[in-house]
Regions:
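Surface-exposed binding/hinge segments that line
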Residues: 124, 158-203, 220-227
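Gly/Pro-rich hinge or "lid" segments in bacterial periplasmic/extracellular proteins
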Residues: 43, 49, 71, 88-102, ...
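Short, well-ordered beta-strand elements
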Residues: 33-35, 61-70, 110, 120-122, ...
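Extracellular/periplasmic solute-recognition and catalytic clefts
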Residues: 166-169, 224-235, 260-324, 335, ...
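Aromatic- and charge-enriched surface segment that lines or borders ligand/interaction sites
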Residues: 54-59, 79-84, 111-155, 170, ...
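N-terminal lobe/hinge region of extracytoplasmic solute-binding protein
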Residues: 27-117, 124, 147, 214-216
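Bacterial N-terminal signal peptides
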Residues: 11-20
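Bacterial N-terminal signal peptides that target proteins for export
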Residues: 2-11
Length: 363
């Protein structure tokens, strides 16, 4: 009798545990935003008007001229072939806020659904989303984009989405991604970053080939003119479907964005000082210290400014091949680190622009 009762009690306890686990796994969350962890607070509520760091009344107009190193022979950025130039015409299902660690809000998607175990995610698309030719963006486009990138896209897509079992159309504006395993908390957010491409546009075009035909997109900009390998001019789409979304309010203010291509960074610096481009983000300490001592800076015509930020900057250091006997001893590696004269290098080679790396997560 005691043995039977013990087994019955154990069976009941296991049943309750399994039922509790299944209930927790099947519990569905939904909302206008999604975070890495469901316990994280969302800064912007369902009816927010704009991101705090943007000016919703920012004036629109004008243009900017930028410089890029290299060249281009294609606008198909989704394959390995060719040297493609990106455009502002492709959108994703979600967009991230810049003042939260990893919280996403809907762009093409209006809302999301996901279980506690994150074994799948559903995106409910905005019915007003449109391609530049006026055709609605639908679940067919999302499913086709995923399947095509997995089958014909650059190899990186197959690796990036390798944990996804399938993309499934649930309705005209509703799509679900099923995952091979539960528990990957980032995967639903990753799928929101899927570039959404127009199925009808590619129906009679070869996705695996390079092309200089300006692509059809749904985003705030489209290509106005270009010269292969030389420059691209993008224009703001006046009737862009998403211009009044809260996530876009205060953004996409320029009428035109021109990008000129140069042989190297030195050529871009010369173009900036000559007034041929408007902006450059400098990443070389020597150039920052020495290359901008020009009259235009002294007169205030060219502004040189260091912009504080709180973004992790990564780390720099020595990487040792510990398969070699000489580097297997931790004390040897530590001694080589001490032997490196950081202060002299920083003063002599880097114009005093660097600080010591104290963490893998600097800044």
């Amino acid at each position: 009798y005691n043995e039977a009762m013990r087994r019955l009690s154990l069976f009941i306890a296991l049943s309750v545990l399994v039922a509790s686990h299944l209930a927790q796994a099947s519990e569905t969350n939904s909302g206008h935003a999604m975070t890495m962890y469901d316990t994280e607070p969302v800064k912007y509520g369902e009816n927010f008007s704009h991101f705090d760091y943007l000016n919703p009344n920012a004036p629109k107009g004008g243009g900017i001229r930028l410089g890029a190193v290299g060249t281009f022979d294609s606008f198909n950025t989704f394959i390995a072939k060719g040297n493609a130039a990106g455009t502002g015409s492709v959108e994703t299902l979600i967009t991230s806020s810049a003042d939260e660690p990893f919280t996403v809000y809907g762009l093409i998607a209006a809302s999301f659904e996901w279980p506690n175990d994150r074994s799948w995610v559903i995106f409910n698309l905005r019915s007003q989303a449109r391609w530049h030719d006026g055709t609605p963006v639908t679940a067919d486009d999302v499913v086709w984009s995923f399947d095509t990138l997995m089958e014909k896209g650059a190899p990186g897509y197959r690796y990036y989405y390798s944990a996804v079992e399938s993309a499934e159309k649930l309705g005209e504006h509703r799509v679900r991604f099923n995952f091979k395993e539960a528990g990957n908390r980032e995967l639903p957010l990753i799928m929101g970053q899927l570039p959404v491409l127009p199925k009808h546009y590619w129906a009679d075009r070869d996705f695996t080939e390079t092309t200089l035909e300006p692509p059809l997109g749904s985003g705030p900009y489209r290509i106005k003119e270009f010269e292969a390998g030389r420059y691209i001019v993008q224009e703001r789409v006046p009737d862009y479907w998403g211009k009044n979304l809260a996530v876009n309010r205060g953004m996409n203010n320029l009428d035109t964005i021109r990008t000129d291509y140069y042989r190297d960074a030195t050529s871009i610096r010369l173009a900036l000082k000559a007034g041929d481009i408007d902006l450059r983000s400098e990443n070389q300490s020597k150039a920052w210290a020495e290359d901008y001592n020009v009259e235009a800076v002294e007169k205030g015509l060219l502004k040189k400014e260091m912009v504080p930020h709180q973004m992790p900057t990564g780390m720099q250091g020595f990487v040792f091949n510990t398969r070699r006997g000489i580097f297997k001893d931790p004390q040897v590696r530590e001694a080589l680190g001490y032997a490196f004269d950081f202060e002299w290098s920083n003063r002599t080679l880097f114009n005093g622009q660097y600080t010591r790396t104290a963490s893998y997560f600097s800044n």
